[in-house]
Amino acid sequence: MKKSGSGKRGPPDGNHQSVAPEKVGWVRKFCGKGIFREIWKNRYVVLKGDQLYVSEKEVKDEKNSQEVFDLSDYEKCEELRKSKSRSKKNHSKFTLARCRQPGTTAPNLIFLAVSPEEKESWINALSSAITRAKNRILDEVTVEEDSYLAHPTRDRAKIQHSRRPPTRGHLMAVASTSTSDGMLTLDLIQEEDPSPEEPASCAESFRVDLDKSVAQLAGSRRRADSDRIRPSSHRASSLSRPWERPDKGAPYTPQALKKLPSTEKSRCASLEEILSQRDTAPAHPLHLQAEESPAPVPSQPGQLSRIQDLVARKLEKTQELLAEVQGLGDGKWKAKDPPRSPPDSQSEQLLLETERLLGEASSNWSQAKRVLQEVRELRDLYRQMDLQTPDSHLRQTSQHSQYRKSLM
């Protein structure tokens, strides 16, 4: 029988002959269709390396094979099964699909194994061989040293870049994003070796920009503080108290920021140090004098609990007075001896005393309830203020302590 010229891919090299075959066996190969049925012929197949040898009879030397196929020309090996066929051959067919690249002349191969287990074995072996053949082509690619890409900036001379001072826009952006407590540090460090061209003018312009930015930041902080004080004072004035005298208050006038001389400025300053002058400046807080202060404004839950205990004791005392007055009245009116009953003047005095005690008790009761309600409202107000400005509350405690005490 003549050898197939289309399937021949060249004589195998010495490396392939030295390698033991991975899989050998008899399978049936599809050779075309006849008039009535398909033509299947028994073939002896040897898988060695990335070559597949097919011959009509069992041979010891692969050179005597009629057909040799290079597995690098094939894409995959998979099972071939028809959807509506009930034949036993349908469970043992597998195919080698060629690559869909232009110029590929390798044919599609269809085989029929002896059993489905043998079919799976051939599929696994051929798939591994195809993968190795593809990788072998990639491994053979070599790159010469002359073809390396030259790095455009590796050998470039390095230039020492000096640090420029921050601009006014950068300082304003940092100041606008800073926190309310002013603990953010502004980096104002200049280089040790400034540019030889007009160093004094550069330093003077930098100081002027710094003074302007600090003055604007301090003014915005004072406006924010005055806005926080205004709703609290309005809230305190809305509370109705008979002993309150709002006409004797003095308005709060914030002092202007004292500009620091240029000799006292450090090269690295923080907002806390710059704005410390506002805390030390004299201020005139609002004083509200009261004839009587039942309890101080609570700043902690412990003080609120003490005020509640005081109110409870007042209530107990009032109840005791009421019980005592009621007992005295019952004892006087239920006396068995009519001649020993008190005269009209004594009964009137007793009634007056009882009315006075009841009036005091009711006034104490209403005053205690009013104080407790005001304390709760003030507590809610300070909680809202603390939620809005949690960081600035501690700094304003020392400045407005007298104002908070005078609210009661």
Swiss-Prot record:
Purpose: Plays a role in the regulation of the actin cytoskeleton through its interactions with actin capping protein (CP). May function to target CK2 to the plasma membrane thereby serving as an adapter to facilitate the phosphorylation of CP by protein kinase 2 (CK2). Appears to target ATM to the plasma membrane. Also implicated in PI3K-regulated muscle differentiation, the regulation of AP-1 activity (plasma membrane bound AP-1 regulator that translocates to the nucleus) and the promotion of apoptosis induced by tumor necrosis factor TNF.
Biased composition regions of type Polar residues, renumbered to the chain: 389-401
InterPro entries: PH-like_dom_sf, PH_domain, PKHO1/2
Gene Ontology biological process: lamellipodium morphogenesis; myoblast fusion; myoblast migration; regulation of cell shape; regulation of myoblast fusion
Region (Disordered): 1-20, 217-265, 389-408
Lineage: Eukaryota, Metazoa, Chordata, Craniata, Vertebrata
Segments forming a coiled coil: none
Encoding gene per record: Plekho1
Post-translational modification, as annotated: C-terminal fragments could be released during apoptosis via caspase-3-dependent cleavage.
Record keywords, A-Z: Cell membrane, Cytoplasm, Membrane, Nucleus, Phosphoprotein, Tumor suppressor
Region (Interaction with ATM, CKIP, IFP35 and NMI): 135-307
Subcellular location: Cell membrane; Nucleus; Cytoplasm
GO cellular component, one term: ruffle membrane
Site (Cleavage): D309, L310, D344, S345
Domain PH, chain residue ranges per copy: 20-131
Site note Interacts with capping protein, residues: R154, R156
Subunit and interaction comment: Heterodimer or homodimer. Interacts with CK2 and actin capping subunits (capping protein CP-alpha and CP-beta). CKIP1 and CK2 together inhibit the activity of actin capping protein at the barbed ends of actin filaments. Interacts with ATM, IFP35, JUN, JUND, NMI and PI3K. Interacts with AKT1, AKT2 and AKT3 (each isozyme of PKB), PtdIns(3,5)P2, PtdIns(4,5)P2 and PtdIns(3,4,5)P2.
Pfam families xrefs: PH
Bilayer disposition of the protein: Peripheral membrane protein
Protein name: Pleckstrin homology domain-containing family O member 1
